[in-house]
Amino acid sequence: MDFKRVKGVALVLSASALWGASGSLTKILKLHGFSITDILSWRYFIGLGGLIAFSRMLSEPPALHIDGPRFRTALFMAVCIFGTNAAFTWSNFFTTVANAIALSFTAPLFAAGLAWIFLGETVRILHQVAIGVGFFGAYFVFGAYRAAETHTALSPNIPLGNGLALLSGLLFGWYIVVARRFAQRDGKVVVGTIWQFLILTVLLSPLMILTLFKRITGIGYLYLTVYSTLCTAAPILMLNLSGLFLKAHETSILALSEVPFSIVIGMILVGEFPPAATWWGVALILVAGFLGSMRQD
């Protein structure tokens, strides 16, 4: 058994489970009075604190100093993940949780093409099938919701939300490719991730002040802390670490598992129950994840 590969698969699945809760928590944060700018500015500051605390608990805490080339890579990754998170978070203000997840996870198609162009990765037949099955499954989920979609207070503009979710899929596919290249070339993944969050914290810090003037309850900030650490910092770090063990297109296929996670969590937290046909799409996505976890060299 290839234990490094098992570790990579476990990292992506864990990240998907945590990220799967982000859509539902975004809607909860909206109900507590947070705007898109509030969420995007505070999530990286709070997440940065969590990452630094985690790094200090390691047996050999890494030095946080980085040189120029590593900083430029961290800056580029920060811009990519900010675009991904901004588009996805905003999409959850307008469309359903499942629509946002399903359309954002066109990422394997983009990741496969970009990895082939920039990393020279060959997507062999079994993984080609996995990408096709996963994409069809995500589209099936989207189609099932579209047939039964209704505009609600939590999903007021479904077409706009769907477009933003599709944009996040493109950006996420690109981010996975960049993260894989950084992990393979440098290896200092924890430090690179901390710098991603530090860069975004500095850039977005002026917006944080505006949040303090809002009458948001303590429970709202508690939800924001959970969202920032467990649904932002932790999955991004796990995704970056998976680049040490998996190819970019493999990571993106396995990340499709976020769809069933998000649907189940959405049912529990915000009461969004999917149409029955949705579960056929979920089944296809699970098949794609199984095929994607198989080694193809």
Regions found by a protein language model. Name each.
Residues 34-83, 110, 170-178, 193-211, ...:
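Transmembrane alpha-helices of multi-pass small-molecule transport proteins
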Residues 1, 44, 220, 248, ...:
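C-terminal-most transmembrane helix of multi-pass membrane proteins
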